[in-house]
Amino acid sequence: MKTNKLFAALIAALLLLGMLFACAPADIAAAPANEATNLQEVDEIPAAEGTGIETIDMMGREIKLPEAATRIVALSAADCEILYAIGAGDLLVGRGEFCDYPAQVLDVPAVQSGMETNMEQIIALAPQVLLMSAMAQTEDQVKQLEAAGIQCVVSDAKDINGVYQAITLIGAVTGHDEDAFAVVSSMETTLSELSVHASELQGKSVYFEVSPLQYGLWTAGKGTFMDEIATMLGLTNVFADATGWAEISEEQVLKANPDVIVTIAMYFGEGQTPVEEILARPGWQDITAVKNGDILNLQNNELSRPGPRIADGAQALFDFVKAIVSENKAA
């Protein structure tokens, strides 16, 4: 039991670290890039002559490969998901230690990643390409990797449009352009259809809990995927006035009185589920969402990880709130 609690605490801390450091360090050199990039611009990025590939990564760096990569190390969980989604998962020869989806990625050798990435482990795997986020390495580390013949490609989505760009970029690097386009098109279709029906959710208010009470409450404010999806669905994020991932108090949640609570806390099979824990919190019984039991637990990173399943998370949230609205109408 104690082990599970410690593991849960570690997971919560890692999730917050990944969210809080979703920006580039000052010492990574970046070429100038357009601040606003839409899907149409992204679709025009790949430009290949013969078997060679030329593209621009998400730090504005020019990427040139003699041919589509066949050996890849991906440090971020989102990039691993993208590779499998576009049918290129078999190209992975190494992954960041926190990459966990889909299940088959766990069969790929793991390398130490995050703030203490192990350069020697990566070089030993002899990849042609390393997929990394903007905050993953310093400029000196990038030079070390590229001196070893490894092309570093930055994939760093900060909004839904950035996810489209990341998928398109990885499709270009792997020669899976058409598969990438299909994934992006499917996501666009899903999200577009949801936005058309946003009025059906009646502007319900929602509180996103990204870290549970026992580890300190954190929520998603402006500039996060969760807030972007809430806005798309016509929902009101009760902490939209916060910026990024914000630490909050119980009193602030009680005052906000959300109609719906979305928690991404993990459950490891012992004790209360995340929903049961929220329902049992002293003093929370007067919150509308708690009073009505309108609490959604999404444990699989659909709303927090910048990958293809963002659309699935949006669909799950829409369906949950739509059911609440329908039930209220029937009452």
Residue ranges, per PLM feature:
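Short secondary-structure boundary segments
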Residues: S76, A134-M135, V210, A242-W245, ...
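Structured C-terminal subdomain patch of bacterial secreted/periplasmic proteins
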Residues: E49, G162-Q165, A172, F181, ...
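Short helix-initiation/N-cap motifs at beta->coil->alpha
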Residues: M58-G60, P109-E120, A242-E250
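Extracytoplasmic ligand-binding site segments that recognize negatively charged/polar headgroups
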Residues: T138-Q141, V153-L169, G203-F225, G269-Q272
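A short, structured surface patch at a secondary-structure boundary
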Residues: R71-L125, V129-M135
